[in-house]
Amino acid sequence: MGTGYRTQALYIGSTPDPARRLAQHNGLCKGGARRTADEKRRPWEMVMVVEGFMSKIAALQFEWAWQHPAATRHLTADAPSKEQSKTHEGIEDDDAVKKPQQKTKGLTDSRATGEREDDGKKKTKRKPPARRTRTSLKAHLEDLHLLLRSTYFKEWPLSLRFFAADVSQQWRWLCGRVNESIPTHIKMVADGNCADTSPQCDHSLGVGSVREIGVDYTPIRDYLEKATFLLDDMRGSYCKICKEQYVDNDWAVVCPEADCTSTTHLLCLSRTFLDATEDPERLVPLTGKCPTCAQTVQWPLMMKELSIRTRGGRLLHNMLKKGGKRTRTIQKAQDATAESDDNASAADIAVDASHEDSDDTDSLIDYWDRILGSDSESGASIHSQYGSKASGTEVNIEKNVFLDNGLLD
């Protein structure tokens, strides 16, 4: 919103860095937009932010639809069309325009044929999008309300962040007037100088100002390190849902809970979350319960981690380099656990060996007396005893093999 001495001007744009973009609009750094370059409209103020888009393309789609409500296919125009709003005078003007067109009948056949050929060669130019006819703040908020309720955008994990109290108040007034409400998962955050105490607004997610909006991936660095460490070598790991081992180039996701190491196929988890919603029209889930820890996790957060891990490139390398100390700590903890398990196994082997070596301490005479003096019943019991011991060892070996292959927890 431009707050210069002229009438307040409104501008809708898209940016990955709100603080930098606001400085560009105010001429503090290179960049900006042509419509915000007028010094008489400066300084510009960012009154609200729609955030939570899954990609840059998604943000641009929403931006274009909000800028061109009369042309977008996501909105139904409330205003009557030109054909319905024509006055009697306008109809007469159209008839007057049509009359000269009848003179073309007097053209020669050759001239008419030439014009038709020229028209066939000309390429049809794409019409520019219809301009916005309403430019007030109220009109912009009404269009935003319609977009958030549209079939295409209502399933997106978006949130509204208000930095101006008057804009937040007008939005609440609009929501109270409209019969239909926006989806409940779309959050409203009262930030900046907003003193909104309504239950719809969340103050806990406030950052204070536009400059404090986080634009990097620092909040999910620990989550990214854990996922990269768990899926570094996918051989031997398996999906917690379908119980199948991963193969190369499998899309796997990791539970964002700090104490959970659950990994699943992307499609397996998506199908599980969608089945739990019982909504056949939903294509992308929003939340769901982890199959291992049963905690409710956010699908957009998991997709953000997956995108950085698979397409981050240098960004991923730098984040993991900064977090290398924590990764080494995790590795040491796992090594210590493995070492303790090895020590326990070695102790068990030593105990078994001590029992077996106890027979070697007997003298040769005692040994032959015990063997020759034993009857068939005692021999049968000895055979049964050693047979059961061998069976138990075999079961333990099979269990260890399954653990190595990742088939058991």
UniProtKB/Swiss-Prot annotation:
PROSITE patterns associated with the record: GIY_YIG
The protein, known as: Structure-specific endonuclease subunit slx1
UniProt KW DNA damage keyword: yes
Biased composition range(s): Basic residues: 122-135
Ranges of Basic and acidic residues composition bias in the record: 80-90, 106-121
Domain GIY-YIG intervals: 1-76
Annotated zinc fingers (SLX1-type), start-end: 239-293
InterPro entries for this protein: GIY-YIG_endonuc (IPR000305), GIY-YIG_endonuc_sf (IPR035901), Slx1 (IPR027520), SLX1_C (IPR048749), SLX1_endonuclease (IPR050381), Znf_RING/FYVE/PHD (IPR013083)
Subunit structure, interactors included: Forms a heterodimer with slx4.
GO cellular component terms, semicolon-separated: Slx1-Slx4 complex
GO molecular function, one term: 5'-flap endonuclease activity
Enzyme Commission code: 3.1.-.-
Record keywords: DNA damage, DNA recombination, DNA repair, Endonuclease, Hydrolase, Metal-binding, Nuclease, Nucleus, Zinc, Zinc-finger
Span list, region Disordered: 76-135, 325-345
Gene Ontology biological process: double-strand break repair via homologous recombination
Gene behind the chain: slx1
Intracellular or extracellular location(s): Nucleus
Family: Belongs to the SLX1 family.
Principal cellular location given in the protein's record: nucleus
Cofactor needs: a divalent metal cation
Function per UniProt: Catalytic subunit of the slx1-slx4 structure-specific endonuclease that resolves DNA secondary structures generated during DNA repair and recombination. Has endonuclease activity towards branched DNA substrates, introducing single-strand cuts in duplex DNA close to junctions with ss-DNA.
